A protein has these predicted regions:
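Rossmann-like AdoMet/SAM-dependent catalytic core
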Residues: 1-50, 59, 95, 105-122, ...
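Switch II (G3) loop of P-loop NTPases
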Residues: 126-133
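Short, polar loop motifs at secondary-structure junctions
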Residues: 58-59, 76-84
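Conserved SAM-binding loop of SAM-dependent methyltransferases across substrates and taxa
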Residues: 57-70
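Conserved acidic residues
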Residues: 96-99, 129
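A short alpha/beta connector and helix-capping loop motif
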Residues: 134-173
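Short loop/helix-cap segments at secondary-structure boundaries that form the rim of catalytic
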Residues: 65-68, 82-91, 143-146
Length: 250
């Protein structure tokens, strides 16, 4: 396949339409670092059952703040580190990654939920930052997706523009799957040095907050640009945060 600039722009246009932040009946707050590892989430949801954290990398400020606020256990999965330094008792660490099928060092979210006795829970929280593997798990094989009331995910688009074009159907499947079940309530662009490079006002790496649809009583498309002062913070301190406003009618 040869690179087609027009098709590349078309795929980027679709991404902007798939990921549109909404104002809802739920207030927002930040949990975690005031840099990479912190996320903007929604308040006012039913009491959480537990936190599932994928891709912690021995950095658990999010899990600590989650426990301090909600007093809930964390189930942390990361096959790239051997342990969590000064691990608190409320945090259960597993040296195991997450994928769309079981391997020697990976397993599915469904199996994790089942193994931990949460199969009947409807208010789990997930934090997912797995460096591109998110595309593998967000599909119809993810049977317990609606056991989660809120999910924050860092998405990683391919580095190469031609790979973006080749991934069009994957983007279609993933974001259709998510938007059928959840409302996008926030997006924040990661300001790492390798972006932005999509010349369509869309970042290559971005964090999205999703709330399950049945928990959102009112919503309308956000009318303000991001980042939000006091909530959003640059992932890479010392570099300017990236401004997003593509959802606002010009």
């Amino acid at each position: 396949m040869e690179f087609d600039p027009e098709r590349f722009i078309k795929v980027c246009d679709k991404l902007r339409k798939y990921i549109v932040p909404h104002k809802t009946n739920l207030n927002k707050m930040r949990i975690g670092n005031k840099s990479d590892g912190g996320y903007v989430i929604c308040e006012g949801l039913p009491e959480y059952d537990a936190l599932y954290s994928y891709g912690s990398d021995d950095q658990i400020t999010f899990e600590k703040e989650f426990y301090n606020k909600y007093n809930k256990q964390s189930y942390v999965y990361d096959h790239t580190v051997d342990s969590i330094t000064n691990k608190p008792d409320y945090l259960h660490f597993f040296k195991e990654g997450v994928s769309n099928h079981k391997t020697h060092n990976m397993d599915t979210v469904d199996n994790h939920v089942m193994r931990n006795g949460h199969i009947n829970c409807k208010n789990l929280f997930a934090q997912i930052d797995i460096e591109g593997s998110e595309w593998k798990i967000l599909n119809s094989n993810f049977k317990t997706i609606e056991n989660f009331s809120q999910i924050v995910i860092e998405f990683h688009l391919p580095l190469d523009a031609l790979q973006i074009i080749r991934a069009e159907s994957m983007f279609d499947n993933v974001f259709t799957f998510m938007n059928e079940r959840f409302v996008c309530t926030h997006i924040h662009a990661n300001n790492s040095p390798i972006q932005p490079w999509l010349d369509t006002n869309f970042p290559r790496i971005f964090e999205v907050t999703y709330v399950r649809k049945d928990l959102v009583t009112t919503r309308e498309i956000e009318d303000k640009p991001y980042p939000i002062d006091g909530l959003d913070f640059a992932c890479a301190p010392g570099r300017a945060d990236l401004e997003l406003d593509y959802w606002i009618e010009k």
